[in-house]
Amino acid sequence: PQFDEFGVGIIITSYNELQFYLSLFNQQLPIESQFIKQLADSLNAEIVSGTVQNVSDATTWLGYTYLFIRMLRNPVLYSIGVDQLEQDPLLQQHRGNLINSAAIVLEKHGLIKYDRRNGNFQATDLGKIASTYYVSNTTMSTYNRYLKPNAGEMELCNIFCLSEEFKNIVVREEDKLEIAKLLERV
């Protein structure tokens, strides 16, 4: 829910798992944010678009997310102590720390330049490529590590197969025979 506190979801599942989802629905358990896993990549996109130019902008931007709402409602789950919440009810410091950590990761992978003294961000060409083509920062790091100017076709295929974006792709049973035939030719 972009600007609201609730949303509508559609669950498509197998009959075997239907009871599990019905029990979740009946208990009215809140759906927790998974945004933290993609924070660095989302921050990179905001930096590239020019929406976020420094830590202060990014901290404000993070305050508009569902993650922020869930951190306020369930602070313990997000490693926020009660005393920390009392001292900083809007979690300004915690959000700043999350942004700082994400910026360090992006800088390490060569996607941004991060001036820690004044908190300014600057997108790099690699960061622009990653944002434009939805390539994760970890995949860009892999490419930086393994891509060489003289890489052959097989080497390029192997490197691209290391992409994080492919990690959840499962080979269908009906495709296994065709893949085995392809492997015989290699």
PLM regions and their residue ranges:
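Low-complexity, interaction-prone regions
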Residues: 14, 185-186
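C-terminal accessory/connector segments of nucleic-acid motor ATPases
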Residues: 25, 29-179, 184
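Conserved segment of the helicase C-terminal RecA-like domain
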Residues: 1-29
